[in-house]
Design a protein with these regions (language model features):
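Charge-dense, helix-prone N-terminal extensions
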Residues: 1-129
Length: 129
């Protein structure tokens, strides 16, 4: 993890570090790993069971993504995207990374994670049959 983080430009690195701290605080027990140049958070060791990701961008911001974000309550309208499930929040500063509304989104998705992942596994199993 440290090797990945230290390779980032300083501003993006600071934002990414803060987002990792916020994610760890709000997703106790989540597995954290690097996958496709992003920090992933999962309920298992499989990257296919990811719930969230932190993706540093070259343009100076960091995306905090939610694989099941379309179903999350978002009263502060932080989530961006129009896909079937995926949503993300663009974070431009360490202060934005500390936003309590973002922490609530992270905690909510983690609370729902087992049910969401079980649903995906059921669909995959059905499609293989």
């Amino acid at each position: 993890m440290e090797e990945f983080l230290s390779s980032l430009p300083s501003g993006v690195q600071s934002i990414t570090r803060e987002l990792c701290a916020v994610a760890r605080k709000n997703m106790p027990g989540a597995l954290e790993f690097i996958y496709h140049n992003a920090v992933g958070y999962s309920v298992s060791e499989s990257p296919f069971d990811r719930i969230c990701y932190i993706a540093p961008q070259k343009k100076g911001y960091v995306n905090f993504g939610f694989f099941f974000g379309a179903g999350l309550p978002d009263p502060k309208n932080l989530l961006i995207g129009d896909g079937k499930r995926l949503r993300h929040v663009k974070i431009w500063s360490v202060e934005e990374a500390k936003n309590p509304a973002l922490a609530k989104l992270i905690a909510q998705t983690w609370k729902e994670a087992p049910e969401l992942i079980a649903g995906i596994h059921a669909v995959r199993k059905k499609n293989k049959a």
